[in-house]
Each structure stands twice: as C-alpha cells, then as structure tokens.
Amino acid sequence: MVSNDNPDHDSISKKLARRFISELKKQTHIDEYMYRDIGVNPPQFITQDWIGAVFTAKAKRTAQQQQILAQSDMYIAELAKADVIAISSPMYNYGMPAQLKAWFDQIIRINETFDFDLARGDKPLAPLMSGKTLVIITSSGEFGFEKGGINEAHSHLVPHLRTLSKYLGVDQTFEVASEYQEFADERHTNSMNMAEQKLSAIVSVLSEKKSVNLN
C-alpha cells in the first residue's frame, strides 16, 4: 500500500486505507504485504543525474549511477511483486501531492516498467507489467469531482492516477472517495459511510482471488 498523507495527523484517506487492509486481511490470504508511507518518507525527486543514469546502459552504469537509481530499483521491485496496489492520498490543490508524483516518477522508467517502439506509430509507449488491480482511496475538502459533478473540471487527482496506472501494470481499477471534509456536516458523515461500504464491496470482489500480494 502507498500512503501519502500528512504524517502529523491521522488523515481520512489513511483511516480508510487501514480499514480496507484490515478487512482484506480477514477475508483473503495475503502472501506478502508491503506498506510505504511516502508522506513520512518522501521519494527523491528525479534530477538530470537520475535521467542520465536511466539512459545509460545497465552494464555501463557507474557505481554512482547505480546508487542514484537504487531507490527507483527498490520501488520497481516492490511493484513487480504486487497483485493489488492500494494508493491512499488527499487531494492537494485539486491534484496529486508532490510526494506521490515523485513515487510515480521513480517507478515509470523506460525498459523497466515501459518500453518505447516507434513501430507502434503515434503511441510508441507500452507497459511491461500487467494483471494488477489498483484501489484508489482519496479524500477532499470539497465535493462533486466525479464525472458530471460540479467540480469535475477541477478533478486532477484521480484522472492523473488513472493515466499513470497503466505503467504500473494495472488492468482493473476501483475508486473510493471521501468528500465534504471542510464542510464538516452530515454530508461528510454520509460520504465517509458510503466510502466504507464501497471498500467492503471491493474487498468482497478481491477476496474471490483467495490469495494476493498487496503493495
């Protein structure tokens, strides 16, 4: 599971993610569970040296270049093991927090999670992994970010996650959102209840797989 929440408080998206993991553990066998709190331990941002290392043939990389890519290699190895990926994140300024974007930047790497072939025409990029399930758990202070909602035009978190998810090898995606946080009224309570119910339904679907590796 990848969590990107404020480390100073027990955030809503983190609470929902913990509930999801707890229910999934009860209903199915998890072969391996990996948890990464990138709010507490943020990934490194990519640099020109990082890009240079990526585009250097593996056999020709210096010790320094190997060290530069060590974190990326670790994240990719974790991803490769996972059948189910759970990402919990708040919406920051209508989009993805910088730490979560940095995690994707470390993982989406040519010849590791995607390749490039001009023979494919106008869409030369293709993912190298497949068969994974992604559970997106988000929280927001406002509401109506769903398709047709009053804030759909400002929804840049889940659409971004969906765009990038194919490079994680994701074939199936579930979304759970808690909204109205800043309003702190009955609508927020109802939104939380609906999110919890939806997570339980997702667990029921995933439990049919009997055994999973969870990242």
Give residue spans per PLM region:
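Glycine-rich phosphate/pyrophosphate-binding loop and the adjoining helix
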Residues: 146-215
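Active-site donor-binding loop signature of nucleotide-sugar glycosyltransferases
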Residues: 38, 139, 178
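Short, acidic Gly/Pro/Ser/Thr-rich loop/turn segments
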Residues: 8, 43, 142-144, 183
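Structured loop/turn residues at beta-strand edges in well-structured enzyme cores
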Residues: 80, 98, 129, 168-171
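Short, glycine-/small-residue-rich phosphate/pyrophosphate-handling segment
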Residues: 116-164
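N-terminal beta1-alpha1-beta2 submodule of the flavodoxin-like/Rossmannoid cofactor-binding fold
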Residues: 1-104, 109-112, 197-215
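Residues at the starts of beta-strands that form the adenosine-phosphate
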Residues: 32, 133, 172
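Structural beta-sheet core signal
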Residues: 1, 87, 134-138, 175
